[in-house]
């Protein structure tokens, strides 16, 4: 009898909890009136590469992981050292460590260091890189997100106007659609490639609808000992090796996203 009472209380509690989450996500959440977008207009074409210094191209990756949730500190330390060593051996100038919901300060001694983390922890992979982050935002929605949900999360991350927001792996689990990119705004970059695939089909609706968004390419590496997971997608940035200069270059498009096809390679030596 007591077991049945406990079971019933648990089920009622679970039902109320899920109902609360549904209300917060779909009823209480901010509602936007998205204006109908239009293509870029004007007499001139913006050229981010105008007056660049060809001696200042730096190679960078901002999306790589050294930890999963609840990983012990010693394991994280070993993974961080290994990640740094691998990228340095391949000639990278800027090495970003974007752990989930955690800022890794391993590279803080470098003038180019930009605190970054991957935001988002729900099943549907609506994730963003937050560059120049001062703190972690735990706002997220557990169920499939509406366009309003997606915009609200971006706006909350962008409350600190010094941050740079990058939407990553939009195709994973159908997190975002080309329709979403017709209307979404207030972010800086789209990660157009990672170690697994390209996401270029999402960039056309961004530009076609007049959104000033630039591209990035990053490994999104999780298995550093797997050659196919590291050093195949990166950014060439025209910048000084100083944080503010790097951020300005990314925000103004003074960079090139690069994706190598290494599917046939089997070893690091290749």
Spans of model-derived segments:
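Solvent-exposed, non-transmembrane amphipathic alpha-helical segments
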Residues: 107, 133, 207-210, 266-270
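C-terminal functional module detector
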Residues: 1-53, 221-270
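Residue-level recognition of short, well-ordered coil/turn positions
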Residues: 162, 211, 254-255
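Generic structural signal for residues positioned in beta-strands
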Residues: 112, 127-129, 189, 233-238, ...
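A metal-dependent hydrolase metal-coordination microenvironment
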Residues: 25-168, 177, 183-185, 192-205, ...
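An aromatic- and histidine-rich active-site surface loop
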Residues: 174
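Glycine-enriched alpha-helix->loop->beta-strand junction motifs that scaffold or abut catalytic
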Residues: 111, 184-190, 210-214, 231-234
């Amino acid at each position: 009898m007591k077991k049945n009472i406990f079971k019933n209380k648990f089920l009622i509690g679970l039902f109320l909890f899920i109902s609360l989450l549904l209300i917060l996500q779909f009823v209480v959440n901010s509602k936007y009136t998205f204006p109908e977008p239009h293509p870029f207009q004007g007499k001139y074409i913006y050229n981010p590469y105008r007056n660049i210094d060809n001696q200042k191209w730096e190679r960078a990756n901002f999306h790589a992981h050294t930890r999963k949730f609840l990983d012990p500190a010693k394991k994280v330390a070993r993974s961080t050292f290994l990640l740094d060593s691998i990228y340095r051996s391949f000639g990278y100038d800027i090495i970003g460590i974007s752990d989930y919901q955690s800022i890794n300060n391993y590279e803080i001694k470098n003038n180019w260091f930009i605190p970054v983390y991957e935001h988002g922890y729900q099943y549907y992979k609506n994730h963003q890189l937050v560059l120049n982050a001062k703190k972690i935002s735990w706002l997220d929605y557990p169920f499939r997100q509406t366009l309003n949900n997606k915009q609200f999360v971006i706006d909350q991350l962008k409350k600190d106007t010094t941050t740079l927001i990058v939407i990553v792996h939009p195709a994973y689990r159908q997190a975002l659609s080309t329709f979403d990119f017709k209307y979404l705004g207030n972010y800086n970059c789209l990660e157009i490639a990672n170690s697994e695939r390209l996401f270029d089909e999402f960039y056309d609706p961004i530009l076609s609808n007049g959104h000033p968004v630039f591209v990035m390419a990053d490994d999104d590496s999780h298995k550093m000992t797997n050659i196919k997971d590291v050093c195949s997608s990166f950014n060439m940035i025209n910048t000084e090796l100083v944080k503010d200069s790097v951020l300005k270059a990314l925000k103004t498009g003074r960079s090139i996203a690069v994706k190598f096809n290494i599917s046939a390679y089997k070893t690091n030596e290749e």
